[in-house]
Amino acid sequence: MVKVKIEFSGGLELLFGNQKQHDVDVPVQEGKQLTAGHLIAWTRDNMLRERPELFVKGHTVRPGILVLINECDWELSGATESTISDGDVVVFISTLHGG
């Protein structure tokens, strides 16, 4: 298990029970590392309450959602292949707003 703090903002929290912060234990296979892609799939399957099309597209987040791992843009560390470790903070921020 990997202990991760997940935060949602920019309206994404509405898809996750209207709760912005979650402390979760994510299972990983023996000898494997948790990746951001695996975390997204686990979050979709275990935490998402409604409208998955607003959070995921294929095996990643929808365009317009920023992902920060320990305050760093995940694009700098490999996006879905970024490694997530015990105690990491992963933030999902929607930049899309209706109008």
From Swiss-Prot:
Compartment(s): Cytoplasm
Any one Pfam family match given in the protein's UniProt record, by short name: Urm1
Record PTM text: C-terminal thiocarboxylation occurs in 2 steps, it is first acyl-adenylated (-COAMP) via the hesA/moeB/thiF part of the MOCS3 homolog, then thiocarboxylated (-COSH) via the rhodanese domain of the MOCS3 homolog.
Modified residues (1-thioglycine): G99
CDD domains attached to this UniProt entry: Ubl_Urm1 (cd01764)
GO CC terms: cytosol
Pathway: tRNA modification; 5-methoxycarbonylmethyl-2-thiouridine-tRNA biosynthesis
Family matches, as InterPro entries: Beta-grasp_dom_sf, Mopterin_synth/thiamin_S_b, Urm1
Keyword annotations: Cytoplasm, Isopeptide bond, tRNA processing, Ubl conjugation pathway
Record-linked PANTHER family: RURM1 PROTEIN
Protein's name according to its UniProt entry: Ubiquitin-related modifier 1 homolog
Origin organism lineage: Eukaryota, Viridiplantae, Chlorophyta, core chlorophytes, Chlorophyceae
Gene: URM1
